[in-house]
Amino acid sequence: MKAFDYSLVKDPQYFCDNRMEAHSDHVYYRDGNEMQTAVQDGTETSFRYSLNGLWKFHYARNYKSAVQGFEKEDYCCYDWDDIHVPAHIQMEGYDAPQYANVQYPWEGHEEIYPGQIPERFNPVASYVKYFTVPEHMKGKRLFISFQGAESGLALWLNGAFVGYSEDSFTPSEFELTDYLKDGQNKLAAQVFKWTSSSWCEDQDFFRFSGIYRDVYLYTVPDTHAYDLQIRAIPEENLDVADLEIKVKTWGKGSIAFRLEKDGECVLEEKKSLTEAGNEEADAEAFYIQKTNSSKTVQNSFVWKINNPKLWSAEDPQLYDLTIELYDEAGNIQEVIPQKVGFRRFEMKNGIMTLNGKRIVFKGVNRHEFSSVSGRHVSEEELRKDLRIMKQNNINAIRTCHYPDASLIYQLCDEFGIYMIDETNLESHGSWDTAEFTKDYTYVVPHDKPEWQSMMLDRANSMY
């Protein structure tokens, strides 16, 4: 059985282990009735099971002080403290929020070289959640999604090491199927405040740590779309648009599309996945360090849409796209609702244009932040932010300086707000030190090959 090696946390090349690769964040439902109920009542898809709530918790100032072996099945954690998930530990009474701009948060406390991590003070948050697999999920492949954990996450299930992930601002997902048992399961996680990747998370903001976004279990049907790419781009005359959909699927069967505008059907078509597939790849493309899984098929579809109503911040016209997947027997497997906006972005003579007209950005840099809960922002607070922006003629947001939780992207489509999504990659503290000392080997990531894979992974994870 593979074991977790904490010494690797200071290696820039160790940023994921057995973690699923990035994929689109679309929600899928069992059938149309479940989808309609969810849209009307705000209920969750039955393919997901939330683990939000109280978890057992232990805080340590550093790894040496953390409880060793707590992840084992026979280690009892019931007398530990309770902590809310999602939440920053600093907003729950452990450690303290720290604001820093260019300086790294450990400067003046411990001298370390880029890539290394503090040892005397580097808080470790140990979490435990006991759960039983819901009846309707039994017998299915089971996955877990941590939508945000800052900044390094190690995971165990029933004493077995599942995997590891860094990047504080994009999801970390793992398959749990091979580690499950009947009855109660023990899920254990350790979150490290600083890892080698923290050298590239030197943003101008408050420094927190912990599991601060949603956590949920999920299953997939036998025929499943795990990744979607939708491009809706008008031709230059804007009278006709190309609707291109790329979908990567597991399993065989068929796929159906229906595009509507204001209740009127614009497009309806059904295709065989086996006939439409134009690229077959081993599931290693979907996993990191995981083999023995089924094949995946990528399908591409393109349609011409006449006289499209165009999306802009001033007039955010959206179409309703419904995608249905069926197995080979014709049984519906999942239904995926998506909002689609047709718009044409171009650079003309050095000027950015949308739908043939010059864009005038009246925008703001927006941190994902609540005065009450830090970077765990409620839907109510987020909607309030966006309403105030629109009321004050703000039409653009830059997510400084990292990807936000998924909801804001959907809401910007609906509200009519241009979105500039920033990668979680900032290391200006190393530049200042190098400028002062004239030791430019201190700069990261620079041209150092050991940082390359981590950088590319962060760009690829920005779904």
Predicted segment positions?
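Active-site-adjacent substrate/metal-binding segments within catalytic domains
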Residues: Q90-V133, M137-S145, E150-L157, G163-E166, ...
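Intrinsic-disorder/low-complexity, polar/charged segments enriched in Ser/Thr/Lys/Arg/Asp/Glu/Gln
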Residues: S50, V124-T132, R141-F143, P171, ...
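Accessory beta-strand-rich segments of carbohydrate-active enzymes
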Residues: K2-M20, D25, D41-G42, K56-N62, ...
